[in-house]
From Swiss-Prot:
Any single biological process term in GO: nucleosome assembly
Comp. bias intervals (Low complexity): 1-15
Keywords: Acetylation, Chromosome, Citrullination, DNA-binding, Hydroxylation, Methylation, Nucleus, Phosphoprotein
Protein name from the UniProt record: Histone H1.4
A GO cellular component annotation in the UniProt record: nucleosome
Cell compartments where the protein resides: Nucleus; Chromosome
Modified residues (Phosphoserine): 2, 36, 187
Residues the record lists as N-acetylserine modifications: 2
Modifications made to the protein after synthesis: H1 histones are progressively phosphorylated during the cell cycle, becoming maximally phosphorylated during late G2 phase and M phase, and being dephosphorylated sharply thereafter.
Amino acid sequence: MSETAPAAPAAPAPAEKTPVKKKARKSAGAAKRKASGPPVSELITKAVAASKERSGVSLAALKKALAAAGYDVEKNNSRIKLGLKSLVSKGTLVQTKGTGASGSFKLNKKAAAGEAKPKPKKAGAAKPKKPAGAAKKPKKATGAATPKKGAKKTPKKAKKPAAAAGAKKAKSPKKAKAAKPKKAPKSPAKAKAVKPKAAKPKAAKPKTAKPKKAPAKKK
């Protein structure tokens, strides 16, 4: 049993390695095909731009220019026609004569000018430096930490009014004690002033005795 157990995992190992090699070969072959030359659309645009004919380049003249550049025209005849149609639909080429792939073609100046303008836009692609400015924003967050210091200072201010309130409360009973003895001596003084006023009616009694003397004079 111990001899058969290690033999089982050893068998699937070569089966796993084989598809990896096939994928590597396929990717290498695809890379070689792509690196063989530029696409047909680029060759067509270069050939049309190089021609000096005002009426445009005919399909026959275009094939001659591509053959002179080393492009196999006979094998890629269908690709040339498809490339012409796609360039006309995009607006890079203008068909001056004929319909479809047959006829004469001319480079669209507006499209060429539009292709030249995107180059400065690439320079504007360097604008992602603004994220560095976004990194500066966290510095403002450090400034937001300053209110925390102010929040720590506020409790100190709250303690001061509490101490002042305690001092005022301590002072207020002193005023109350000083006010009570002042009112007490005033009350007996008023009472003394009232007693002599009550003695005045006693002086009025002798005035009533004057009429008694009048009948004595008649005698």
